[in-house]
UniProtKB/Swiss-Prot annotation:
GO biological process: mRNA pseudouridine synthesis; tRNA pseudouridine synthesis
Record bears the keyword tRNA processing: yes
Protein name: tRNA pseudouridine synthase B
A GO MF label: RNA binding
Upper classification of the organism: Bacteria, Bacillati, Cyanobacteriota, Cyanophyceae, Synechococcales
Gene name linked to the record: truB
Job description of the protein: Responsible for synthesis of pseudouridine from uracil-55 in the psi GC loop of transfer RNAs.
């Protein structure tokens, strides 16, 4: 089977770990060079982009935002901040209208400080927090800054204390923490009931496929690989027009921009990455222009010599 470089967008089902999905793709495609773009907890479903081949080198250049649909259960606190965890407290939730509840959600919009759940992949003294948790070790996690781009109250079941939210957030945001902390600001408790990621790193649920469906496709599963260049549409582009420039690029040397690229680069932010392609629109890698915007520095070079 021909192995392509690019991304397969998995619609992860409950019970699978992100690593399970990576291992299955490795097995199906017969390649070890496979990696995911960010862990989804086993109980969380939805969009999990998986990079294949040289695409693994471009993960850091993908859009970092993620969007979820989640249900929060008020009145219950658990050790893991989700409904699967051991219950440690129960407390009545307040009677609120949709508008009143939405005002409380304002505390979680924009840039906020958030303490991750103890069952998380955050490092504590060189070890993952979840490993310490399952060894019953005592430890504390420090607040971290995260950004909530959008937080929409979609439904509010006042009788059962369940609200549904849509949330777009930065990498590193824990929705379980929002569930827990919302319970706190309501003078109640809270935990995450269900969570589905509908988009991540510029990829969307509508383009995803379940692992079980990929397995059924067997040798045809490579047709679902999205070429890396399409995943970088959000990045500005420069075209290397001649072989001399390409030779300089492939050997990692500084390239003096020609007149056409000088005009283009004048509009670029020199601190941001640039997608480099050739005349055939083939991806060559990622570069940065200098502060004077007249030279190109190779940063990530495909087919380096």
């Amino acid at each position: 089977m021909e192995i392509k470089d690019g991304f397969i967008i998995i619609n992860k089902e409950k019970g699978y770990t992100s690593h399970d999905c990576v291992q299955q793709i490795r097995k199906l495609l017969g390649t070890k060079k496979v990696g995911h773009t960010g862990t989804l907890d086993p109980g969380v479903t939805g969009t999990l982009p998986i990079a294949i081949g040289s695409a693994t080198r471009f993960i850091q250049y993908l859009p970092q935002g993620k969007t979820y649909i989640g249900q929060i259960q008020l009145g219950i606190r658990t050790k893991t901040d989700d409904i699967q965890g051991e219950i440690i407290n129960k407390k009545e939730w307040p009677i609120l209208s949709n508008a009143q509840l939405d005002k409380f959600l304002n505390k979680f919009r924009g840039i906020i400080q958030q303490i991750p759940p103890k069952v998380s992949s955050v490092h504590v003294n060189g070890e993952r927090a979840y490993k310490k948790f399952f060894k019953n070790e005592e430890f504390e996690l420090k607040p971290r800054e995260v950004k909530i781009e959008e937080l929409v109250l979609k439904k509010w079941d006042q009788i059962n204390g369940i609200l549904e939210i849509k949330i777009s957030c930065s990498t590193g945001t824990y929705i379980r923490s929002i569930a827990r902390d919302l319970g706190g600001v309501l003078d109640s408790e809270g935990c995450l009931l269900n969570l589905k990621r509908i988009s991540a790193c510029g990829f969307h649920e509508k383009n995803s496929i379940k692992i079980s469906d990929l397995v059924n496709l067997n040798k045809n599963c490579s047709t679902f690989i999205i070429p890396t260049i399409y995943a970088l549409d959000h990045i500005s582009t420069l075209i290397l027009n001649n072989q001399e420039e390409i030779n300089f690029w492939e050997t990692g040397r500084l390239i003096k921009l020609d007149e056409e690229n000088l005009i283009k680069s004048s509009k670029f932010d020199y601190k941001k990455p640039i997608k480099i392609i050739n005349n055939q629109k083939m991806l060559l890698g990622i570069g940065f222009i200098n502060e004077d915007k007249n030279k190109l520095h190779p940063k990530l070079v495909l087919n380096a010599k």
